[in-house]
Amino acid sequence: MPEGKLEAPSRTLVLPDLLRCLVLTWSEGRADLLRSAARNESWQATVNIDVREFLRNVFLLRVPLTFVDLPSVQQHDYSIWQNAAERTKDLSDSLVVVCGFGGDPLEELWARQLGAWAYLPGDNGLAGLELIFGDARKAVANKALVCVELDGYR
């Protein structure tokens, strides 16, 4: 390459085999399902059932994806779970996925106003969860690619 010419950065991005994500869910059964879906799409999930532990991990861990699995609106501590999602947006720059319990339109509106990257209107089973984890992996890769390209031109 002739001297004085800058080479544009490569558009090839190599991601680690397992990306890390943080998950908050309300039951052991859901935790197992979410862990499986994440693993099947190359995510290494740190799954929390306790909201305080989750918020501590949001603060301590820098992960590109955070998944908040909300309980039923009728559950007495539902607002605590919503608050956890809001704090996640305040404390991190990760993509936030909100999974609702039963497709409540007000819940979806709240998630959209929060700035959630994606909202799932209820239990989509393993295949639906794998789809969202796969899409998130692509979004994180694209975000990283943009950062790599911008850094290459400095």
Per-range role (PLM):
Residues M1-A37, I132-R154:
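Non-catalytic signal-transmission and effector/linker regions of two-component phosphorelay proteins
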Residues S92-G103:
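A short, hydrophobic beta-strand element within the central beta-sheet of small alpha/beta folds
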Residues I49-L65, V73:
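Acidic, metal-coordinating helix/loop segments flanking the phosphotransfer/catalytic sites
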Residues P64-R87, L91:
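Conserved phosphotransfer microenvironments
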Residues N124-F133:
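C-terminal output helix
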